[in-house]
Regions:
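Short, low-complexity intrinsically disordered segments enriched in A/P/G/S/L with frequent Arg
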Residues: 5, 10-11
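Flavin-dependent oxidoreductase catalytic cores
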Residues: 26-245
Length: 245
């Protein structure tokens, strides 16, 4: 899927780089009505309600996500308006950033009350600011905490709770590290995993560079699907051409 018109000072076709594409390896695990066949990733300063509404006009089937919303900002009212969305946007998920279980539970309830179809926990953003808040990609070093966060979020709401993460962080870039992380986190009951097929570099690269510099390792994600056939695995990163998958 390519978008050709401009928005927010950038070309919409650039969105294809960030799109999430479901891996069609085990079709028996995916119903005809799966809402994750094709998704637009959460993008700060881009995927607000106006952008999402435009994307919904372009496609009635794509799954949409909000920008990442930090739990602290939502709880203290600094960005509550970011929860607003047009009912025409469905299906649409909200992405939360945080690691405090109590805060995540409170925000999850707010999101469900607002009418979202899914809540996604950000464990993939490598920015310095996010690290200072102890959330994003740095949480891959604390799989037990991530699992506990997701478990409590799921117990607090009835809508699905998913996670977006990287292959690893810094020098933790082996498949074994990723496998162990997924193995621990899935015990929370989480079934939907969005995997950015790159390592996250916590120091030395900007968020923009982290979307391009670390090499793509799609084979890691394919191996995950083999090792965890019961999970819904969504691949992210460099998705410019469907035929690559």
């Amino acid at each position: 899927m390519l978008f050709k018109d401009g928005l927010h000072g950038t070309s919409l076709h650039n969105y294809s780089f960030y799109c999430w594409l479901y891996i069609h390896i085990y079709p028996s695990l995916m119903s005809k009505n799966s809402i994750h066949k094709f998704c637009i990733a959460p993008m700060m300063q881009y995927t607000d309600m106006h952008d999402r509404y435009l994307l919904r006009l372009i496609s009635k089937k794509v799954f949409l996500y909000t920008e990442m919303i930090a739990t602290g900002s939502l709880i203290y009212g600094k960005c509550y308006e970011q929860l607003d969305f047009n009912r025409e946007e469905h299906p649409v998920g909200v992405q939360l950033g945080g690691s405090d279980i109590k805060d995540l539970v409170e925000c999850s309830k707010k999101c469900e009350q607002q009418g979202y179809d899914e809540i996604n926990l950000n464990v993939g953003c490598p920015s310095d600011r996010v690290q200072k808040g102890k959330f994003g990609a740095c949480l891959m070093l604390e799989p037990m905490l991530v699992s506990e966060c997701l478990s409590n979020m799921q117990n607090a709401v009835k809508i699905p709770v998913s996670i977006k993460c990287r292959l690893g962080v810094d020098n933790h870039e082996s498949y074994e590290f990723l496998h162990n992380f997924i193995s621990t986190v899935k015990d929370s009951g989480t079934k939907i995993f969005v995997i950015h097929a790159r390592n996250g570099i916590l120091n030395g690269l900007s968020p923009r560079q982290n979307r391009n510099v670390p090499p793509l390792k799609y084979d890691y994600v394919y191996r995950l699907k083999d090792d965890f056939p019961e999970l819904e695995i969504i691949i992210n990163g460099g998705n410019q051409k469907f035929r690559r998958f």
